[in-house]
Amino acid sequence: MIFKDKTVIITGGSEGVGAAAARMFADAGANLLLVARGKKNLDAIAEELRDKTRVEVFVMDVSDATACADLFKKAQFEFGRIDVLVNNAGYHKRGLAETVDAVDMGRMIDVNLKAPIMLSRLALPYLRDAGGGVIINVGSLAGRAPVPNSATYSASKSGLRAFTYALYEELRGSGIKIAVVSPGPIDTGFIMSDIDQVSDLTFSQPISTADEVAQAILDLCGNDQREKSLPAISGLLTTLMYLFPWLSPHVRPFFERKGARVKRKLKAQARQ
């Protein structure tokens, strides 16, 4: 896909994967509408990129249905078209399902599942008017292989993956594509701030960079894939566990021990 003069909306666009994707889209010549709850970081990334392309910002909570509708009206008003929607905003509160606050559970469902469903639905007529376009949902390997201490998060990402696959079929032949990128742990700093609550199983997999996930987002815009897992080997492992669930009790302890070693090493490095 040629991004020159295309309009790209990125939720969660102020930092991490969202900011990395914004930089790559800007380098490719796309116009950007960046969305986040925090104005300070949003303004900072917008100012950084304005020498390269046109950038607008919209401060909002993606769980606000009225704001979601206003987002597309703003994009249409500012740029005259919408070509790509990246549903990247996310929320993750780790802990045992019995102890995680009900408000946090609800917010994970609202932000990680309900919001991208609503935003995708709202985007469709605008993408159709532009002659076609792309929706990229940022999922997680936890949506393919549920992770302890992240039960609700895993459920929200699994639901997002299922929605993506179903809508992909509904949109077949329409000129509008939807896909999901499913990364494992990402080196954005957030994972280290809550490391004691992160499952050992999570750290058994290679940690991706925000740039690697962002590049996968751009790649999915221009190919026929419905899903891209990062790292690829982790995606293969989750597929095997899904196809052969009887394997899980045998291999899981190995990966948990491996992850525990990695976690201890990371914590030691953080103390230095």
Region spans (language model):
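Active-site helix of classical SDR
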Residues: 120, 156
